[in-house]
């Protein structure tokens, strides 16, 4: 699924592309939502995050709002209390990973998948199993093209 890119004008008339992927802090919130079986209230997200981060409840709410503005999550209003929202992920973890990876390659490797993969392979120590797994992925991609 292609993401929708939002363009806004900055002062001086320059066009700026609005980010549509989760930031590092937003990713922590998304991990909680992706791990959940169902939608969660802000209070539930905050409770789950208290075990792993020192982020304030206010900041979690701010991040939920940013994620909603980016179209990564959505919410339903509680039937009994209109002040309570139930948040859920609109984009899967895999979708976000692919989009983040694409932006990373575009930003740091001028869109070259080959250069990005070469840099990652050269900077990482892999086991024989990991090399084999990568080889299998490349072969599968090659078969899928034909």
Regions found by a protein language model. Give the residues of each.
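Short, cationic-aromatic polyanion-contact patches
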Residues: 21-25, 78-99
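Short acidic, hydrophobic short linear motifs in intrinsically disordered regions
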Residues: 39-48
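Glycine-centered, phosphate/nucleic-acid-interacting loop/turn motifs that mediate DNA/RNA or nucleotide
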Residues: 71
């Amino acid at each position: 699924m292609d993401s929708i890119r939002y363009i806004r004008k900055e002062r001086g008339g320059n066009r700026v592309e609005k980010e549509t992927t989760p930031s590092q802090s937003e990713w922590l919130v998304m991990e909680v939502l992706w791990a959940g079986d169902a939608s969660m209230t802000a209070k539930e997200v905050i409770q789950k995050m208290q075990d792993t981060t020192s982020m304030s409840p206010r900041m979690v709410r701010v991040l939920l709002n940013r994620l909603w503005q980016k179209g990564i999550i959505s919410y339903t209003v509680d039937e009994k209390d209109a002040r309570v929202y139930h948040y859920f992920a609109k984009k899967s973890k895999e979708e976000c990973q692919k989009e983040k990876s694409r932006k990373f390659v575009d930003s740091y490797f001028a869109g070259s998948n080959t250069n990005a993969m070469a840099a990652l392979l050269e900077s990482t120590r892999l086991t024989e199993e990991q090399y084999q797994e990568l080889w299998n992925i490349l072969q599968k991609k090659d078969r899928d093209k034909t």
